[in-house]
């Protein structure tokens, strides 16, 4: 036929049977990719340390989505929380992956069947015997079925009535588990961090979808609207479908990047804004002050800080630090986290506590500056030692660790103090294993960053596709140079007298 690459899909334009076939094949490929990717990730995933080596540090992409829907156990005998799996059953990680592979095979077979048996009576208008699809009715059917699915997910899966529930955690990502969630029908349901809103919105949207589907099945569109929106043209379906997809892609890009109940930090990693706002740092400080007010020593107060919480307060887990063109998991950058060294407290000779100014998100290097409680600079690591006034040596800075592996240890050696001051710029200080994965020391983005980047790119492409195909279908007659409706529509008794041929325009 000699079609250019961007017009090859015209071969299924007026062929409903093979249009179904190519969509079945596409769904087969998507399902097959999901199952295959899950098996690959399970093959390389290390479940041994859910605190310092969680799935998002290992670059897992499909496992977090399975986990947030309630899958937590593996046929390999492990669970996502680090415990031993007792009886994983069918709905384990491997079971879901296998189900996708089986579904892919069935869809593949269905695609071949529809490609071979493409000329079904179902696709022909009984009055004219021409290939024809009742697109408004098909729209109603799809809307009704998707509404049932949406309602079922919110009313049964999320609530735990018939299903496991979804992943629910606290704001600091410490206590996450799969739980049944009751729908929130008041104003709190609009809080993006309230999991009850997920259930309520799916129930409400499902009911709306069912009602809208029934409406479109029962009510025919007006002729002017049918013609104006080109409802008889399959390219109209393509254009509006692309609009739905690009809108969804933009929405999930936002919920992933800014955070929401649907994208818990235990599964996808923290957001960049939690570093920018000192979210975890403030919570750690609050807990420490509470412990100190109870009469505990500094070592005891810091020892009670969960290692998981301290690890979130580290800039290497900020998805905006990774860059868009550095391939690999976070562990391929700074390495596999082995342990928390403890909280570093810096003091000058007089005993006043100093605080290292933390590196902002979009800096690769940042001057090492230590300030007092009033924000006044008291010490630094100077660029030119000959002009320095506040160097570590001159001020006599020492560092003491509380909690962690170096609990109670003090260093006075300037070289060692400088080393830990540089590392304190990056938040809490951790020991990393860079040998196992030959990590290069350059930060990588978490799956949160990759997901956002990919979906923004696809949303922009699909937005252009919506405009392109929408314009093609609405202005089809203009582009083709042919008026699709050559005969004027006549409503006798209103615009035209019966038998008056002088004012009516007719095609030749």
From Swiss-Prot:
Record's keyword terms, sorted: Chlorophyll, Chloroplast, Chromophore, Membrane, Photosynthesis, Photosystem II, Plastid, Thylakoid, Transmembrane, Transmembrane helix
Cofactor note: Binds multiple chlorophylls. PSII binds additional chlorophylls, carotenoids and specific lipids.
GO terms of biological process kind: photosynthetic electron transport in photosystem II
GO CC list: chloroplast thylakoid membrane; photosystem II
Gene Ontology molecular function, alphabetical: chlorophyll binding; electron transporter, transferring electrons within the cyclic electron transport pathway of photosynthesis activity
Alphabetized SUPFAM superfamilies for the sequence: Photosystem II antenna protein-like (SSF161077)
Gene3D superfamilies registered for this protein in UniProt: Photosystem II CP47 reaction center protein (3.10.680.10)
Main subcellular location: plastid
Subcellular location: Plastid, Chloroplast thylakoid membrane
Pfam families (UniProt xref): PSII (PF00421)
Membrane-spanning intervals of the chain: 21-36, 101-115, 140-156, 203-218, 237-252, 457-472
Membrane-topology annotation of the record: Multi-pass membrane protein
Family: Belongs to the PsbB/PsbC family. PsbB subfamily.
Role played: One of the components of the core complex of photosystem II (PSII). It binds chlorophyll and helps catalyze the primary light-induced photochemical processes of PSII. PSII is a light-driven water:plastoquinone oxidoreductase, using light energy to abstract electrons from H(2)O, generating O(2) and a proton gradient subsequently used for ATP formation.
Subunit structure: PSII is composed of 1 copy each of membrane proteins PsbA, PsbB, PsbC, PsbD, PsbE, PsbF, PsbH, PsbI, PsbJ, PsbK, PsbL, PsbM, PsbT, PsbX, PsbY, PsbZ, Psb30/Ycf12, at least 3 peripheral proteins of the oxygen-evolving complex and a large number of cofactors. It forms dimeric complexes.
Protein name: Photosystem II CP47 reaction center protein
Species per Swiss-Prot/TrEMBL record: Chlorella vulgaris
């Amino acid at each position: 036929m000699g079609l250019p690459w961007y017009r090859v899909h015209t071969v299924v334009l007026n062929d409903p049977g093979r249009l179904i076939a190519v969509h079945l094949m596409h769904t087969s490929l998507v399902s097959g990719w999901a199952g295959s990717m899950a098996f690959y990730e399970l093959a390389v995933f290390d479940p041994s340390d859910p605190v310092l080596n969680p799935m998002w540090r290992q670059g897992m992409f499909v496992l977090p989505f399975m986990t947030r829907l309630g899958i937590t156990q593996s046929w390999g005998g492990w669970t996502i929380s680090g415990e031993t799996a007792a009886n994983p059953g069918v709905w384990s990680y491997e079971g879901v992956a296998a189900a996708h592979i089986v579904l892919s095979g069935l869809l593949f077979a269905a695609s071949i069947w529809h490609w071979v048996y493409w000329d079904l009576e179902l696709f022909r208008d009984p009055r004219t015997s021409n290939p024809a699809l009742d697109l408004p009715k098909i729209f109603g059917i799809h809307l009704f079925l998707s509404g049932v699915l949406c309602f079922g997910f919110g009313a049964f899966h999320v609530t735990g009535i018939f299903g496991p529930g979804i992943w629910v955690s606290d704001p600091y990502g410490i206590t996450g588990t799969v739980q049944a969630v009751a729908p929130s029908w008041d104003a709190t349901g609009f809080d993006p961090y309230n999991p009850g809103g997920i259930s309520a919105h799916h129930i409400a949207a499902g009911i709306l979808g069912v009602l809208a589907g029934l409406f479109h099945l029962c009510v025919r569109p007006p002729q002017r609207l049918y013609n104006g929106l080109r409802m008889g043209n399959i390219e109209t379906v393509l254009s509006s479908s692309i609009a739905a997809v690009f809108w969804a892609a933009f929405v999930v890009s936002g919920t992933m990047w800014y955070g929401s109940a649907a994208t818990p930090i235990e599964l996808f990693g923290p957001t960049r804004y939690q570093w920018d706002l000192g979210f975890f740092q403030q919570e750690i400080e609050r807990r420490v002050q509470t412990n100190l007010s109870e009469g505990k020593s500094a070592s005891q107060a810091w020892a009670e800080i969960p290692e998981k919480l301290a690890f979130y307060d580290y800039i290497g887990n900020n998805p905006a630090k990774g860059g868009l063109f550095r391939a690999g998991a976070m562990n391929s950058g700074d390495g596999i986290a082995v342990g928390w060294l403890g909280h570093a407290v810096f003091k000058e000779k007089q005993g006043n506590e100093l605080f290292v100014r933390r590196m902002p998100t979009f800096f690769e290097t940042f001057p090492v500056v230590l300030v007092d409680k009033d924000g006044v600079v008291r010490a630094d690591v100077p660029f030119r030692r000959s002009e320095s006034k506040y160097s570590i040596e001159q001020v006599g800075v020492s560092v003491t660790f509380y909690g962690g592996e170096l609990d109670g240890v003090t260093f006075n050696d300037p070289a060692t103090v400088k080393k830990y001051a540089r590392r304190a710029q990056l938040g809490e200080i951790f020991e990393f294993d860079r040998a196992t994965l030959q990590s290069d020391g350059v930060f990588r983005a978490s799956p949160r960053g990759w997901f956002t980047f990919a979906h923004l790119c696809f949303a922009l492409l699909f937005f252009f596709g919506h405009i392109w195909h929408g314009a093609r279908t609405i202005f089809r007659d203009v582009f083709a140079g042919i008026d699709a409706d050559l005969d004027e529509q006549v409503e006798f008794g209103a615009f035209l007298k019966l038998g008056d041929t002088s004012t009516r325009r007719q095609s030749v």
